[in-house]
Amino acid sequence: MKHLILTSILAIGLSTALLAQDQLRLAGGDISLLPSYEQYNTPYKDQQGATISDLVTYAATTLHWNACRVRLFVDPCVTNPDNGKRQGEVQDLQYVAALGKRIKDAGMYFLLDFHYSDTWADPVKQTIPAGWQSLSEAQLLDTMYTYTRMCLRALVDAGATPDYVQIGNEISYGMLWRGTSKNTTDKVYPRDSYTKNPANWERFTNLLSNGARAVREVCPDAQIIIHIERTADATACVQYFGNLNHYNVDYDIIGLSYYPFWHGRLTTELPNTLKALHGSYPDKPIQIVETAYYNNYWPTSGISYDTRETYPATPAGQDAFLGDLVTKLQEYDYVNGLYYWFPEENGCGGATWNANTIVIDDWLNRGLFDPNNHKAYAGLYRIGAYAVTPASVEAVSTDSRDANYYTLLGVSMGADRAQLPAGLYIHQGKKVHITK
């Protein structure tokens, strides 16, 4: 879909404002834990207290989201003998395929986030999967390719073809470390030139390239994202992607995490990094693939920037942050994605607290639902303002003479509703969600 210009005319009397693919702006959330909450019948309600029967459909139709992100672990049961129920480590391939299909059926874009680990991968943990630990470096490179290819093939077959693929999660310091963060010798350092440790940079970029090769083969229309979290350090970000370019890593989009309490202020650190990256790599769009803000308890440690004076740790402060973030990102035409991390957080799970229905042990207090009454916070409704979808209902109107159904990309699917696959369509100027 790269640089695809949509030219389909939907019907007689159709009024369109069709956008080029590179004008698309994605907005949504990483909803990786939603099915686990649903499994324990956790209620989701709108601001007025009305029940939301399906949050994925609600996101597409009411929140105006056009994309969702889902993480994928290799074998989460290895580190979680209770089948990974606690702490959110449940996202194996079968789980992700089912959730990915729901996202696609709702008419949204699907961002797949490969962790290449059995557990959380982030700047301090890039633990090699248990089943891969005995592999030689040559075998590991091959497994990076075959595993990525196998997963993507399974998702395509399940009707959950990813539109965007992250090769790793927050891989600022590399990936697939042998050993712990303290003793591994596999790290790369984003502020350093590759010349300081060429062996590690070559290992790391070869892994990335093998993952990217699998994406190009199985999902040729998907765009590849390289995701880091050094957003407070513009110099490190520029150096890092310069190192990747030296090794000819194949990717399309720069992905950043932006949590203001770790990565700096909306008025300084974030714009400085966005401008520096665009100035150095003008051919690479940028997406904020993770963001969030506290709605309640403010941690007593682990915080780099105290932003409470501007944005209190309250639902109103969270809402104000999201409103300002959307406004700020709209200033940069080279930023084309915004994902809220874990918006579905809704207490420990279940309608009321019960030790048998615990999805997570601890509340992060960054979700977009009140964990006590399960009502949506105002911030839930902010994110969709960033979205711009080609041929969206906001840009399409048809008259009653056109009986055809159209995808959100303007493709006619015919007039026989019974023959349509599940998904979100435009029919006579309205969004219609069809289920099977």
Regions found by a protein language model. Name each.
Residues 21-58:
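Boundary/entry segment of secreted carbohydrate-active catalytic domains
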Residues 388-409:
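Residue-level detector of functionally pivotal "anchor" positions at catalytic/ligand-binding pockets or at interdomain
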Residues 59-223, 229:
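Substrate-binding cleft and catalytic face of glycoside hydrolase catalytic domains
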Residues 424-436:
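C-terminal tail/sorting-segment detector
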